[in-house]
């Protein structure tokens, strides 16, 4: 890898890490001796994985989401209320993620733009599948689409709408 690309990736890492610290308000006061060891990159993507604009969009969204989780989510409360059932855990985790991302989107429009771009990108990657019944769609995927549509006001594409259509009435009855 050339020195120029390596330098650019290091600057990008610094910028994203600094942005994450500011959003999450996780910076060390000069008078404090505390050293922050939680300054890690989101684990699903690293700077070295960047090879396209889509990767950069995903990385920005992951950093923003990670920062918002740190700012707005209390791990102790989250764990105390975490359901035992695996399916319920997944739905609970999705609802919590939507909650803190929604708070962040209300706080900063740049975060909203980054997250929305990433969700649109994810939806557009998914291919048309054979969807005939509710059993063809995982409840967690449908629930995430429901949360995106109804709380984050993201316009779903036709494939996502079809996936959600099998579950939407059930979610409406349970939530509204």
Where are these regions (language model features)?
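Basic/hydrophobic alpha-helical interface regions
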Residues: 1-176
């Amino acid at each position: 890898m050339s020195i120029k690309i390596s330098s650019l990736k290091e600057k990008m890492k610094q910028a994203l890490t600094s942005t994450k610290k500011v959003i999450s308000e996780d910076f060390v006061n000069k008078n404090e001796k505390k050293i922050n060891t939680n300054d890690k990159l989101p684990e699903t993507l690293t700077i070295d994985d960047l090879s396209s604009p889509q990767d950069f969009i995903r990385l920005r969204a992951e950093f923003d989401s990670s920062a918002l989780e740190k700012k707005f989510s209390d791990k102790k409360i989250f764990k105390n209320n975490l359901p035992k059932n695996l399916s319920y855990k997944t739905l609970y985790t999705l609802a919590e993620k939507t909650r803190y991302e929604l708070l962040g989107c209300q706080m900063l429009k740049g975060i909203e733009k980054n997250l929305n771009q990433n969700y649109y990108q994810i939806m557009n990657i998914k291919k048309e599948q054979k969807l005939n019944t509710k059993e063809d769609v995982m409840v967690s995927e449908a629930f995430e689409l429901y949360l995106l549509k109804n709380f984050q006001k993201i316009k779903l594409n036709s494939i996502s709408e079809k996936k959600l259509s099998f579950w939407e009435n059930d979610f409406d009855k349970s939530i509204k």
